[in-house]
Regions:
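Signal peptide processing junction and immediate N-terminal pro/mature segment
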Residues: 19-29
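Bacterial N-terminal signal peptides
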Residues: 10-21
Length: 264
């Protein structure tokens, strides 16, 4: 049995408002009351399941996506499907439909991914749902400021609450974690309050974030006081003055967790 997945991310902040330059066919033209989409760069985190005849497979993803003029998309995605991981850059298209939802179509090596996004009154994407048959996946969106990131952008206090799944005895078991972290130039010391399969524990950990060159993506490696290693693909969410926090997706096959860790 696959347990339902949820994730919480605070509401997105303001971005730079520009107009999409695409000209959809008259039958697809959005009403004049629709908000003008906000172009820019976004961090996206989603969780859900891919349904199958025999069983459901949990899935989660983290994306960095750019909304460009002319309804064009460019991005990078890291995705977990069960115990496997895949990642790729991609391109796509976006258009406003008659219901004032943005329809996105991403071209990926493993297929075309379609989703619909709800915008707030200022045209900022907040939530989306996957529209591919056989998927039950929702995502939340955060704006990112232009430019690359530094590990030192996270210096200070970072807090999080997240849920995930662990592979045990041939099936997925739920887990939940609350964390408090202190960051200094890419090094982290933290304390985690966790429950795995209903068994609670409190454990300290340390780790190191190594960012890719000229990027906001990086690899985060952590080890707790009991010697257990944890590995993540991380995306620092760049703000206009330092980092707003970071998203991560766990790489360890037996643990599937995506989290939004907020810089205080």
């Amino acid at each position: 049995m696959v347990h339902r997945l949820t994730a919480l991310i605070p509401m997105a902040a303001a971005g730079v408002v520009l107009s999409f330059a695409s000209n959809p066919a008259p039958a697809e033209a959005a009403p004049g009351s629709c908000p003008t989409p906000t172009l820019g760069r976004y961090a996206v985190m989603g969780m859900g399941v891919q349904t199958g005849k025999a069983s459901n497979t949990p899935t989660a993803h983290v994306l960095e996506e750019r909304w460009l003029a002319g309804g064009k998309l460019q991005g990078t995605v890291v995705e977990r499907v069960g115990r496997s991981e895949r990642q790729s850059s991609y391109s796509g298209i976006a258009r406003m439909n008659a219901s004032c939802f943005m329809e996105l179509e991403r071209k990926l090596p493993w297929g075309t991914v379609r989703s619909e996004v709800v915008l707030d009154g200022k045209g900022r994407p907040l939530y989306s749902i996957n529209r591919n048959k056989g998927t039950v996946i929702t995502s939340r969106w955060l704006p990112m400021a232009p430019g690359s990131c530094q590990a030192s952008d996270l210096n200070g206090l970072v807090l999080s609450s997240q849920v995930g799944l662990s592979w045990r005895d041939g099936g997925w078991s739920p887990n939940a974690v609350v964390q408090r972290e202190r960051w200094s130039d890419g090094s982290v010391q933290g304390l985690a309050l966790s429950s795995y399969g209903g068994m609670g524990e409190t454990v300290s950990y340390t780790g190191q974030l190594k960012l890719d060159p000229s990027s906001c993506w990086g690899n985060l490696s952590e080890r707790d006081a009991e010697g257990v290693a944890y590995n993540y693909r991380a995306l620092v969410v760049k703000g206009r003055s330092g980092a707003r926090g970071y998203l991560y997706l766990q790489s360890d096959p037996d643990d599937l967790t995506a989290g939004w860790l907020v810089h205080d």
